[in-house]
Amino acid sequence: MNKVASVILSVLVLICLSCTEKREMTLAQYRNYIEAKGGGFCKTVTAGPLIYTVQYRPPLYIAAAEHKWQFNDSTEMKTRTMALGGIVWFNVRIGTVSGATNPLKSDVSGVAEYNDRLNYWLTQAANHFTLYYGDLELKPQGYVFENSYGLISEDVVVIGFRLPDTTPVRPLRLEYEDQLYNTGIIKAEISMDVLQELDHIQVKI
């Protein structure tokens, strides 16, 4: 084997090792990593007077949140995480650009309009969310609107979609066609490169 071929082979071996090497994190570090603003798992879209923050919630993230970010052991963590496979979940936070007013109350003309807005989020909005997964168009399997009752300046939609795969093997593009504030179609994509990063993270208990 000549020197050039030997160097190329060495570089390829190093690349393979770096691809398979696990990045260790504590649960707190993992939470910060997933929630990082501007990171690959949290997308912010500004549309007119509103801000939509789309947070992808991997199974481990959900399992840890259920256990208040503290597991008894790794078996408990793995068991619950595996049970959550096959459905992808997002939190969609809806706030105003000013941050001074809750979207349900922003420029509302009165109680009747407020109730119409609330009814829309409770009973209709789920029909206007679509997850594009490769060539598939998926509609929600789970939907909850968490009403803050105007106590804070944002409300939250929790929405889930069942995949044909246990874990995503294609990019995830969430779209919401706004029928309430006329802000158009809101899009947020989690790329395959970002999703594959999860395979190289090892959380320590």
Predicted region positions:
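Sec-dependent bacterial lipoprotein signal peptides
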Residues: 1-19
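Conserved functional micro-motifs across diverse proteins
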Residues: 19-156, 160-205
